[in-house]
């Protein structure tokens, strides 16, 4: 197979639609057993309306810690999400999940914290923001 230059690859990507690129990324992840998870690619859930006074305090803060309280029933999925959020290796991510409650991310902005919380909760974890 002929080797493509970086310019040729970029040219090919420029001609693809977003759906085609998304499909390509999925195939690439499967082929090479990697993830291309970016914090911006995680869909955030709507914030909960409960806790009146506490919610007002959280909105004033500009840095948050994402605390993993427990992994729940889907420990493997939670480990995968932790790896995607932190770029930790498999062993380090597993150790973090096993030793919960532990901070997964520290000092991140509100949007990043909420996206991380939604991703971890989607994987079955119990998460708090501080």
Swiss-Prot record:
GO BP annotation list: translation
Top-level taxon of the source organism: Bacteria
Keyword Zinc-finger: no
Pfam families assigned to the protein according to its UniProt record, in alphabetical order: Ribosomal_L12 (PF00542), Ribosomal_L12_N (PF16320)
GO cellular component, one term: cytosolic large ribosomal subunit
Keyword annotations: Ribonucleoprotein, Ribosomal protein
UniProt family annotation: Belongs to the bacterial ribosomal protein bL12 family.
PANTHER family from the UniProt entry: 39S RIBOSOMAL PROTEIN L12, LARGE RIBOSOMAL SUBUNIT PROTEIN BL12M
HAMAP family: Ribosomal_bL12 (MF_00368)
Name by which UniProt lists this protein: Large ribosomal subunit protein bL12
Organism (species): Thermobifida fusca (strain YX)
């Amino acid at each position: 197979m002929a080797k493509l230059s970086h310019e040729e690859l970029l040219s090919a990507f420029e001609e693809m639609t977003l759906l085609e690129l998304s499909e390509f990324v999925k195939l690439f992840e499967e082929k090479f057993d990697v993830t291309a998870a970016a914090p911006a690619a995680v869909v955030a859930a709507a914030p909960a309306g409960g806790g009146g006074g506490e919610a007002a305090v959280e909105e004033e803060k500009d840095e948050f810690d994402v605390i993993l309280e427990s992994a729940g029933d889907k420990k493997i999925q939670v480990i995968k999400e932790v790896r995607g959020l932190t770029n930790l290796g498999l062993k380090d991510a597993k150790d973090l999940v096993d030793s919960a409650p532990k901070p997964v991310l520290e000092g991140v902005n509100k949007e990043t914290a909420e996206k991380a919380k939604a991703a971890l909760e989607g994987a079955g974890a119990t998460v708090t923001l501080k």
